[in-house]
């Protein structure tokens, strides 16, 4: 009993340490996670060199796979940004008369969010919401909240987004399967948490015009944008290649030449590598961008990923310490005695951590470290389902600790209470619906 108390207290204190150092002391999450790693290792009796070796292997093992995918994904996102491909998708969807404006924003967020970091997606796509709000005299909240909810959903549950890819990789989940589940769950959660929730509010949703300081922001001229075909082909190519790999694994005999080729091109690194050169041509060279210009855009994009790479590397270190110290195995036994379904546990831990830390990425890595050790005790629950459950939890409780909360507040010209009442509630509803959809998937599949 005493050993169980020691294990649980070590984990809880480590989490509190991460939260306090990030929220109160303003530590960078990279430093906070490393500090928690050393603390947990020392509490569990690891030697100094043993801790260092575990941290090194954790960072190296995690970034060895993810660094390349994140780097390539950043190039793809940058090409979407500079070419105007994201605006092209939005303008095309606007022509679908049978789609309402709020549903259009959800679809824009889901499609464009595949290649864009969530904050970048908000900054890049919010002018589209401004444009529609002005043309239709619609409250900006009715458009911006569905957009941001969809972007957050894709960020949390659909690889190749870094956090979703990290979770899938650590749990040993099939990437293609997680993509399919994630898109389905993300669509359901975004539609209910965004448009449906806001429609149920009716006249209680206040009218918010485009703030004066953003009134000059607008989408680019349509004639300057790439074609819809080129845009969709570029965005969906890596997803398609990864799905082909999954189909091959399910339906083909291993060892054949075709199987090997499909396994190769469907690997996330290879798929993203191919997609980058397709983007260079379709969204760049074909539109009179020289290689010098493409190099500049690539270098500018890389400047934004140091932050996420360091955080994910430190998350890998924390995971490695939990495993090497024996804490993970002890925790698995303790959690299995709680009689809580692993899907609910995964969702709840990610939800609480996101609210506490303010970062969906950190929350998902922490939840993975806590939940992963107990999965062997539940062979009936697939790692793909747990990966979606963790992402579903991280969608919710976007509050003042999260920079996205303030971004939405600023762009919508909303008060603090209004942002809580409408945006935070929307993300929580989306998270609940994602949990329900995950449970439903687990019963069907």
Regions found by a protein language model. Name each.
Residues 1-5, 180-296:
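Long, contiguous bundles of hydrophobic transmembrane helices that form the permeation core
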Residues 7-19, 26-46, 67-72, 230-243, ...:
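Hydrophobic mid-bilayer segments of alpha-helices in multi-pass membrane transport proteins
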Residues 48-135, 288-375:
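Membrane-embedded alpha-helical segments and adjacent helix-loop junctions characteristic
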Residues 131-239, 405-441:
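Membrane-core helix-loop-helix motifs of multi-pass transport proteins
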Residues 19, 23, 41-45, 114, ...:
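Membrane-embedded alpha-helical segments of multi-pass transporters/permeases
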Residues 186, 342-445:
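C-terminal transmembrane helix pair
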Residues 99-114, 137-156, 174-187, 342-354, ...:
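Alpha-helical transmembrane segments of multi-pass membrane proteins
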Residues 8-13, 31-34, 67, 102-107, ...:
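Hydrophobic alpha-helical transmembrane segments
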